[in-house]
Amino acid sequence: MIDQSAYARTAASAVDRLLTAERDAIGRAGELVFASLRAGGVLQAFGTGHSRSVALELTGRAGGLVPANQLGIRDVAYYGDASPRDILDPKIEREPGLAARIWELADIRPEDVFVIISNSGANAAIVEMARLAVRHGHQVIAITSRAHTAEMAVEERLADLAHVVVDNGAPYGDAALPLPGGGSACGVSTLTGVLAAQLLVAEVVGRFLAAGEPPPVFRSANTPGGDAHNARLLDRYGSRVRLGDA
């Protein structure tokens, strides 16, 4: 039977697995991000499709890291010469050369670190962004599904390029509850991906505190003094951190 209880059991199992099996990987990722930010770097988060929600979770939110910038397909319209119509096709993430266009529109510095999110880990924009980051000497953290990416018939995957891989635990196809006539319902990659993102933030914040330094964290804009606090921190980064989503 498929109902909310069935999904809740599946989701709880996926969360439990992430908290135990990926603990070391998330710790290593936290060390990479901490080292980058402490050196004046910015976390560059990139995802396409529903993986954008995980990149968004890492950027521009209350309790999140201020030096974190979301790269996205939207950038070629926001900051480049593409029209909104050009980016409406969800298959655009498979377009060769798209990652390079996004890269050229961003203010990426040598000390920056990348978190790239993709369940399949195989679409052209994702793999090319990882290649670009590695080629330019950046550390790359992947949040991906090892089960799904292993089934992709491609020459290179995100997991092959990343310095640290966090497995979101999603099954092949992402949806986790099998249907009687074939196929499955109810995805889990966003759930575990967002959790992995917040666990990563916690690791970074903890390292700042252990070093006796205030963590560069956003306050809610809907609290007294929040806007002023955030503006002071954002001023350090200028155009390197773009808060483009309303």
Give names to the regions the model predicted.
Residues 1-21:
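Generic N-terminal amphipathic, Lys/Arg-enriched alpha-helix
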